[in-house]
Amino acid sequence: EKGNPFFDKIAQNIYLGAVRDGFLTAMPAILFSSVFILAASIPEIFGIVLPATVSDWLWKVYNYSMGVVGLLVAATTARCLAESMNRRMPKNKVINTTSVMLASIVGFMLLAVSNVDGGISTTYLGTKGLLASFVSAFITVNMYKFCVIKDVTIHMPKEVPGTISQMFRDVFPFSFSVLVCVLIDVACR
């Protein structure tokens, strides 16, 4: 009972809530991949050797679902945080959750991925990259919030269709979010 006020305060923190909800949103991919790691690993425990093509296929499914969970969590955490912030925003001020997800993915890629000969390193796309996914999500949503509140956007005439107008409104927040991630990447590498 003594700790209830402390835990209530933690439960109301929108950043921790976004991390929780972001993980829960990504849970289907995590559970799906778990089936394939079990199918690939359990036979080996009993001395059963799966054919190479079957084993490769099982590990491929696992690697392309659980192996990109950091990328998924970057997007889902950003969306959940943006939705939470939208509930606290002034009227007529809304953060575009789809654009925030895309910017968070780009920011995550900049923070977590390194170039290697002929491609990119996938080492931090999975669970090893979760810190980068949270950093990317938090930066992105806060940059969007700043730009939306301060009206740092490109305004289009009313005759322009809503989707096109929204795309132009998101140019500056997207750009600033990605640039901040670039600066962090440059400073940390």
Task: Locate predicted features.
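Hydrophobic alpha-helical transmembrane segments of multi-pass membrane transport/permease proteins
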Residues: 31-35, 39
